[in-house]
Amino acid sequence: LSAFTRLFCSDIGGRRLAGWWTRQRRSYFVLKLPHRWWLVGSDGQLQSDLDVPQMEHFRDIAERHMQAGDKVILCLSQPVWVYAQKYRNMGRVFDETDLIYLREEVYAKRGIDVKVYLTGDLHHYRRHEETRESAGTAEPVQKITAGGGGAFLHPTHEDDFSRLREAAISEDVRSRTFEVCATYPSTAQSARLAWGNLLFLFKNPRFGVVPAAIYLMTAWLVGAASGGVSPSNP
């Protein structure tokens, strides 16, 4: 996060960037919403932990402004619940303890509930809902992947994520289970689209011609710029 902070959030060297003036002072935020809801935007980059200043900022906001009974929508950089399941199936571990710590130590101990997890990264839509057995009498937690704004579509049929398990990290934190409630595209539609890639050359024949021309021109320009000099043998 230090590089992002230095470029976009620091007064050192000015805040102008491409004709714009940056105003943010951190890469994460907390926004108060109506009806006692809060929007919390964390910055874990990709496969990185929430750093200490970020965690302390969330703790400070919770202590000074939030109240017991408030609810949180937590925005993440990636669907850690999906990656944790995928790693578990491969016999590996995907560390999600920082998010569990944020939920349990920063919010839950103050009576604040994280009810919605919202992320992108994977370019499709998938919503997991906490099972009734796991939620008990409480309102089920929602975990939503909404990455439809990506330049391409990620498949939804490659692995089975119909049921997820969030492991307990201590005796005080219970394990939780989630079931998929909605997916777009559906697994069947995703599989059909994947098989359709075999016909891509016939569906879009110009796509192969254009990159080939660009690569050829690039190679010619590089060769011309270097004067056609090749390294001599020793």
Give the location of each predicted region.
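Acidic, metal-coordinating catalytic cores used for nucleic-acid/nucleotide bond scission
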Residues: 80
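A cross-family glycoside hydrolase active-site/sugar-binding cleft signature
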Residues: 75-77
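Extended active-site neighborhood of metal-dependent phosphoesterases/phosphodiesterases
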Residues: 1-73, 83-182
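Non-catalytic terminal accessory segments
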Residues: 89, 170-234
